[in-house]
Amino acid sequence: MTNDIYFMTLAIEEAKKAAQLGEVPIGAIITKDDEVIARAHNLRETLQQPTAHAEHIAIERAAKVLGSWRLEGCTLYVTLEPCVMCAGTIVMSRIPRVVYGADDPKGGCSGSLMNLLQQSNFNHRAIVDKGVLKEACSTLLTTFFKNLRANKKSTN
């Protein structure tokens, strides 16, 4: 659990980078053998790419580092429960373990809305550990959206 807290802290640092860019503050870290091999934060608005989620970018970077699309032996740390797209990418990249901070009751596909990561009819499943630094991860998101709503009201 100590390593999980450390790596989630790094994911939170990535999420803060996203917030500074006006992106939804979500950050991701991928480790292998307790070493960080990839890090990323949301860039969807910056790149105007619907797939530029933190998890998706981190997975692409990790695959490049390892020279393989199979990310066996890796752990993905992400500040928000993965969405359907990211959960699919996790399954397809064979990541065996996912650790996330905040639940996403409206779009989470790692147990909240549905659980694609442990779907028995897929040929790969991931262990999911949730709630690591949940409060810090949740606060980043709620603060971001509160400020976004306040800014929209002040411009109207």
UniProtKB/Swiss-Prot annotation:
InterPro entries: APOBEC/CMP_deaminase_Zn-bd (IPR016192), CMP_dCMP_dom (IPR002125), Cytidine_deaminase-like (IPR016193), tRNA_aden_deaminase (IPR028883). Residues 2-120 form the CMP/dCMP-type deaminase domain. GO terms for biological process: tRNA wobble adenosine to inosine editing. Its cofactor is Zn(2+). SUPFAM superfamilies: Cytidine deaminase-like. Pfam families: MafB19-deam (PF14437). GO terms for molecular function: tRNA-specific adenosine-34 deaminase activity; zinc ion binding. It catalyses: adenosine(34) in tRNA + H2O + H(+) = inosine(34) in tRNA + NH4(+). Zn(2+) binds at residues 53, 83, 86. It is an enzyme of class 3 (hydrolase). Transmembrane segments: none annotated. Binds 1 zinc ion per subunit. Homodimer. HAMAP family: tRNA_aden_deaminase. PANTHER family: CYTOSINE DEAMINASE FAMILY MEMBER, TRNA-SPECIFIC ADENOSINE DEAMINASE. Catalyzes the deamination of adenosine to inosine at the wobble position 34 of tRNA(Arg2). This is tRNA-specific adenosine deaminase. The gene is tadA.
